Amino acid sequence: MPLDPIAYKPYADPDDFIREVTDLIWVDRAIGHIYENYEPDAIVHGSYGTSVGVEEVVQGSLMRISATPDRVGQAEDVVWEARGEDAFLSSHLVLSVDQSTDFISRTIANCLYRRGRMVEEWVVRDSLAICQQLGQDPDEVARVKPFIGYSGSMTEPAPQNVLAVGDSGERPDEYRAEAQMVLEFIDRVWNRRDLNAVEHYWIRDLVLHTIGYRTFTRPEGYRRALLKMLQPFPGGRFEVRDVQTHYAVRYAGLRVAVTWVYKGDYNGADDFGPLTGTPVEILGVSQFLVQDGRLVREVRVYDEIAVRSQIHNRRGDSTYASTNIY
């Protein structure tokens, strides 16, 4: 079923819509356009929780632009997929470069647009990269960031059949085999910890771009990056909240975007200070490039500063002792 142009007009297509609207607001400083672009009661799920209403988006955008006026965010990818006849879900990978401070980082904004208006958004930023490049202490930054918590769809159980219906609604049955392969990989390698199976899904010369603006190559590099992410929360599990696919020559072929939440307890490696045993929720988005039935590249974005914020804000006076004696 073709997408009605009312979903993205006056632009050429959803890709053009996302690129141009983003530039209009963030580069040309048309912050007031947000009132036209977002519904008044738009829902935004970020790394620190859920906010409702366009005013917080306007105010937050103004503060970010003012704090980093030389930063330019440029689209590396736009993975979009229809949601009915008049709506689409886009996964917008943004590469931000600030010429005055020389920091570089990535953001992924997954946006549900209906008739050209933002209804719901899931946005994650690599704040760790900025902290490290600017010489800031990640823990000090985290301590002044409030974790509000999630509401709305994020408090409901993860969709049972995300290939049919995700948090953004019913999706078209496109590229089922490739999307199913990505979900199988997440379940087998990420959740069941079968790290030996990386080669089953990936090419040898794989590339992983992840937080801290770090890049890993080859299966062993991928395994070590995943282990590093999981070791503070070894009993946690990934929940897949949404999936979208899109094929475009411009972006090297088929990409599969996955919105996920990792839920665990800080009872493993003490990477973020003394253990607390308290729960953490990590909202993340991964964009996978698939070529010839194999995974080639992943861009994985989540906010480690928000993770540290949850741990710091939930830290009590008593000392937590791990019960794992293996």
Where does each model-flagged region fall?
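C-terminal and inter-domain tail/linker signature
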Residues: 1-326
